[in-house]
């Protein structure tokens, strides 16, 4: 077996990582909308088990993360690295708001609005923030967390939930497809 080195990072990515991450953040709502906008209310609320979130609960979580986690924490870190971050509990927040009974279209619109505000804020920050400030860091239970780490994690968080939505749709198709089977598509 060859021990080939991975391809080098494309120059565009290496030279303008923050800009590229903001572009990815801006594109995410379109991907989510394409996956969920035609779901019925029942499909949006469907869970494969009581321990799993439905798609509407995932959307509620994305709104929380948009407003109470990533944007808020990044702003606090850039403006006052020593400021404390409010605690967040995504599972408790979803339960307290009863996200499962919320309207999918309204949640999607709320998420798109919140993300648009975040992207506008990020574009303004990128225009005024020197690159060195992306290395500002804060002690965190998972280790020191730099502003750039938080920005990259925000974009990665989107992909985790895009995967989660795709999995939920796959599970739903498997559950409702009877008598038809989906095994020919391949393993999940």
Positions of PLM-derived features:
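Short, contiguous alpha-helical
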Residues: 2-4, 8, 44-90, 133-188
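Acidic/histidine-rich alpha-helical segments that form the ligand environment
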Residues: 24-28, 35, 91-133, 149-154
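Short gly/ser-rich anion-binding loops that grip negatively charged ligand groups
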Residues: 22, 60, 64, 108
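Solvent-exposed interaction patches of small proteins and small membrane subunits
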Residues: 13-16, 20-23, 47, 79, ...
């Amino acid at each position: 077996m060859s021990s080939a080195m991975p391809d080098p990072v494309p120059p565009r990515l290496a030279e303008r990582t923050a800009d590229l991450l903001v572009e990815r953040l801006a594109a995410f709502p379109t991907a989510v909308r394409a996956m969920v906008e035609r779901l019925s209310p029942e499909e949006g609320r469907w869970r494969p088990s009581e321990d799993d979130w439905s798609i509407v609960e995932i959307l509620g979580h994305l709104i929380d993360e948009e407003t109470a986690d990533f944007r808020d924490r990044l702003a606090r870190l850039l403006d006052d690295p020593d400021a404390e971050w409010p605690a967040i509990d995504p599972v408790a927040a979803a339960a307290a708001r009863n996200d499962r009974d919320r309207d999918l279209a309204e949640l999607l619109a709320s998420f798109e609005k919140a993300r648009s505000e975040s992207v506008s804020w990020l574009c303004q920050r990128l225009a005024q923030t020197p690159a060195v400030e992306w290395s500002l860091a804060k002690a965190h239970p998972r280790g020191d967390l730099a502003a750039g780490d938080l920005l990259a994690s925000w974009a990665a968080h989107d992909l985790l939930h895009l995967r989660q939505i795709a999995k939920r749709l796959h599970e739903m198709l498997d559950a409702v497809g009877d008598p038809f089977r989906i095994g020919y598509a391949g393993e999940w």
